[in-house]
Amino acid sequence: VWGRALGWYMATSALVAQILPEGRFKEEITDYAVSLAKCLVEFQDKEDGMWYQVVDKGNKKDNWKESSCTCLFTFGICKLIQMGVLDDKKYTDAAKKAYNTIIREYIGEENDDVFVKNVCMGTGVGDYDYYISRPIKDNDLHGTGAFTLMATQYYKTFEESGGHNER
């Protein structure tokens, strides 16, 4: 499963779940988003909290850690935590680990410019070999947008609340 495609599904599911009026559709979308978050945490790299370009093949030697999907997954998990529908401490830990690794290892700086590193360039539909052979780029807008969403939501979830969303 290609990371960024699934990342957008995670992010938009969480956003839609938040804005829908109470009722069956809100409940169904929320359940989908929560189920996806629970599944994604199982594929997260246990050491640094990143996700792979091909999410369900992290054990393959040629697969690589991709920042835009990690940002989108972290955004969705943080949104669900903020909504109060994902309240197990392991999800808070997963979000914090991913966020801190992105900040520490995947943000670059050069000539007063700040950018996101290790982003898969634009991608069409393909198989495993296609996805892992895609060019890796620094300062690609796919990463910048995903990072901005993640950082803003992380702040709203954990900082703006004064830590009240800590689980």
What role is predicted for each listed range?
Residues 1, 24, 28-32, 65-68, ...:
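Alpha-helix N-cap and loop-to-helix initiation/capping positions
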Residues 1, 8, 32, 94, ...:
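Soluble or luminal CAZymes and related metallo-dependent hydrolases
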Residues 1-11, 71-73, 147:
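Alpha-helical bundle segments that constitute or directly flank the non-heme di-iron/ferroxidase center
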Residues 5-6, 55-59, 90, 120:
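Solvent-exposed, flexible loop/coil residues
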Residues 62-65, 69, 74-167:
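CBM-like carbohydrate-recognition segments
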